[in-house]
Amino acid sequence: MSDLSTHFPDYLAGYRETPCPFWSGNSAPRPLQSSTITPPPTQPRQWQERPYFCDNLARLCEENLGGRVSDITFPGGSDRSACLVRWEDGRTAIASFRGETGRARLEERVLHHLNQYAAPVPNVLFFNGIVMLQETLVGERLSTLLANADAPARHTVLASALSSLHQIHLAAAQAGIDQAVPVIGGEEDWIARHIRQLRKIGDAFEIPVPALDKASLQDILLPLKPRLVKWDARPGNAMVDATGKVSWFDWEHCGARNRLDDLVWLLCDESVPFCSATEQALLTEFVPLFADGAPLEVAHRYAAVAGVLHCTARLGLILHKQQGEEGWWDRQEILDYDYIGVTLPQAQQLCARAADWASREPLVVSLVPWFADVAGHIETL
């Protein structure tokens, strides 16, 4: 296999060349101020990781939310941009800090407005333009639940996850923020590059991609009715509580596009075990809810095309990581730290899913045997 580049960072960002303003609403973020300022600790605290960062963050939390911080941990690893803060009085919060202040402001504003309409997202406790503290969502990651569930249980929890995304879409419309967030994936070059990932994988394995009507694919993917979408709606970004309620966190990549994109991001992730019957049933049930007024035939065509290309994007990212890291990754570590699914079964399952979704749409049905060939070549890596 020759070197394989991935366009996934641009795909996730939602633009190729021209970054757009992250929030066009009028209201500005304001930090919450605690009425009681906690005096500094009399003795230095001992932190397990990143002591200087933890000292500063603990002081910030205490100044604005009161109480005494007893512990700060990094469940996803110390290289991640989020950590868990614990107070002596039992309170907890998730602290996140984004490299791009525009994305931080976007995330805070979207969560603020969605919370006004009881959407299943965390409540913001504090924000100062860089650091955001939000409520801790109790439960288990959706990706972990899916890995350990049988087919009926997977159908149930995926249906709950799709219902919660639909609830978020409705809340965004009520809040009037569809036009306040940036349009993502609207550049023609961005869409063309997304489609080209097929050729990159084909070139890497020396398996020519069948001829496709790229102009029609491009037209299908143009977001002509942009609405708020989470966009990065991976199962790893959802928490399921004891009642089965699914809540969504990590909103820095949200924007305005086709609501069906959230359905695609969820169902076409490599952490979702492939089951054609389950996915067909979910598409039948939820495509009408995510269609946003489009005729069902048009909505199903969009879902099929976007789903095939999303599987391709995830596959390209996985193969790029596999080559760069010189091998497949540990499955349990992937689940524990919400890493990309760089395993042979997950890569091949993306091929199976892409072929299955392609079989439903004439514009991409020629890719069915091609994905089977790719899956066979992946076996040799």
PLM feature spans:
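Juxta-kinase regulatory segment immediately upstream of eukaryotic protein kinase catalytic domains
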Residues: 8, 15, 20, 36-71
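Active-site acidic catalytic loop and adjacent metal/ATP-binding pocket
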Residues: 74-87, 215-261
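A cross-family kinase active-site recognition segment
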Residues: 150-205, 226, 255, 329-330
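Intrinsic-disorder-associated, low-complexity terminal segments enriched in Asp/Asn/His/Tyr and depleted
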Residues: 3, 7-11, 26
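ATP-binding pocket architecture of kinase catalytic cores
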Residues: 79-180
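Active-site activation/catalytic loop segments of kinase-like enzymes and analogous catalytic loops
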Residues: 260-295, 306-328
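Glycine-rich, phosphate-binding/catalytic loops in enzymes
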Residues: 150-151, 247, 264-266
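ATP/Mg2+ or Mg2+-diphosphate-binding catalytic cores
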Residues: 312-381
